[in-house]
UniProtKB/Swiss-Prot annotation:
Its main location: endoplasmic reticulum. The modification N-acetylalanine is found at A2. It comes from Arabidopsis thaliana (Mouse-ear cress). It holds the Pfam family Reticulon. InterPro entries: Reticulon (IPR003388), Reticulon-like (IPR045064). GO terms for cellular component: endoplasmic reticulum; endoplasmic reticulum membrane; plasma membrane. This is Reticulon-like protein B5.
């Protein structure tokens, strides 16, 4: 019996030692985890850096990703240069040479049909068989997807215009009015095709330059936005607050 008691005592002591070792190991691991968590605070501060338009994604993702974003950001310089060159050639053809779209389509159709007609007849004379020209048709699913997405965008635009027309957001109303006025002024300077070409060139230059210099542009944009907010507060206090919109809304509710 005495031997059994002596054997049980060391086992109990070993169990206590193991438990204490586990506790010390857990404390040390938790302290090490807390030490590792401390250096992460600067990254959290970096995440709060101001970005234009409040974006949280890279410029490539904002542009939709994929091939179009690669073209706009000049990831493939040959492809981007070719697209911009074709757009420039079209603009020069219609604006500087004053070539008309209907004439261009007719001339392209004449050349294409004439070439295919001569090639099919020559192929029949030489090979005694008619050439196989593939059938061209617009797929129904792709057309429906494009039409559905366009319908959704138009409905969303109508909802925004309706909310603005109801007078729910005066700030948004003023922004839309100013934007439409700027577009009307620019429309007097350029025709539609030139305006589209200018927008196309801007899409091929501004995002690429911004991506390269965003660390310099974003602080300047932050200062500009703060200044605009200050000016808007002053304008709101002196002008907008004096417009009796609240009383008109109250009368409308009572009526």
């Amino acid at each position: 019996m005495a031997e059994e008691i002596e054997k049980s005592v060391p086992t109990e002591e070993s169990l206590m030692e193991k438990i204490s070792e586990k506790i010390h190991h857990h404390d040390s691991s938790s302290s090490s985890e807390s030490e590792y968590e401390k250096p992460d605070s600067p990254s959290a501060v970096k995440a709060k850096i101001y970005r234009m338009f409040g974006r949280e994604k890279p410029v490539h993702k904002v542009l939709g990703g994929g091939k179009p974003a690669d073209v706009f950001l000049w990831r493939d310089k040959k492809l981007s240069g070719a697209v911009l060159g074709v757009a420039t050639a079209i603009w020069v053809l219609f604006e500087l040479v004053e070539y008309h779209l209907l004439s261009l389509l007719c001339h392209i159709s004449i050349l294409a049909l004439g070439g295919l007609f001569l090639w099919s007849n020559a192929h029949t004379l030489i090979n005694k068989t008619s050439p196989q020209i593939p059938e061209i048709h617009v797929p129904e699913e792709a057309f429906l997807v494009v039409a559905s997405s366009l319908r959704n965008e138009l409905n969303q635009a109508f909802v925004i215009l309706r909310s603005i027309a109801l007078g729910r957001d005066l700030k948004k109303f003023l922004m839309v009015v100013v934007g439409l006025w700027i577009i009307s002024v620019v429309g007097n300077w350029f025709n539609f095709l030139t305006l589209v070409y200018i927008c196309f060139v801007i899409l091929h230059t501004v995002p690429m330059l911004y991506e390269k210099h965003e660390d310099k542009v974003d602080p300047l944009a932050e200062k500009a936005m703060k200044e605009l907010q200050k000016q808007y507060v002053v304008f709101d206090e002196k002008v907008l607050s004096k417009i009796p919109i609240a009383s008109l809304k109250a009368k409308a509710k009572l009526g």
